[in-house]
Structure formats: structure tokens, C-alpha cells
Amino acid sequence: MSLSNDDRKALVDYRIEKAWASFDEAQKVASISLWNLAANRLYYALYHAASALLLSDGYTSHTHKGLMSQINLNYVKQGKLLPEEGKLIRQMFTKRHEGDYEDFEETTEEEIREAVPRVKDLLEKLISINALKESKT
């Protein structure tokens, strides 16, 4: 399926909105000590922002691991993102996966408290990379 430029921009904007909504949800569930769910929502905040960035640059991914590979290949290795920023996406994916599927795996309050500002910073960076690209077109 091929998207027009207007459709692509609308989908990118929608995914950015979903990213911020997921981040807000993470903060809300963290406030009631639902740490695994907070990790889930933090991961999906990054996932939606990263998928918006990939789409804006014409890349596609059909799996979570594919998205992480595309981010690493097209943004980390190109110097647009720092290696630790790519690693943060992988770490949050792992926390989300463990919390959702593994027995006896519990995300801690400390892990979430440390992750929230880092995720917010990366969300802002992913979105700013997209905004800079948009301003040049």
C-alpha cells in the first residue's frame, strides 16, 4: 500500500499523538504503582514515536524487533541517535515483554522512576528529528 504525502503526514502525526498519549498513560499508572503496566506504556510511547520517524523517512517495519533494527541501522549508526538511545528502546521492549509474558518478573518503582525522564527526552528527540525533516520539505 502506497501513501500519498498528505496521508503519510497524517499517519505520522497520529503516531506522535499516540506516543504522547502512551507516555501520559505510563505516568498515570505509575502514580498508582502499576509498574509493569507503566513499563508497557513507556515502551509503546517510544514504539509509536519511532514508528512515526521511520514512516516519515519512508522506512517500514512489521515487527517490534524490526523497528529496533531499523532505528539502529538508520539513526544510531548514522549518528542521528546516540547508542544509549537505541539501547533504551531495546531495554524498554525487554521490560515490556518480561512484564507482559514472564512469570515472576516485576518491574520496580525505581526502574520506572529512572526510565520516565529518559523516555521523555528520547520521545522529544525522535519527534524533533521528524520536525526538522518536515521543516526542510
Question: What are the language-model segments listed below?
Answer:
Residues 1-137:
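Terminal alpha-helical segments
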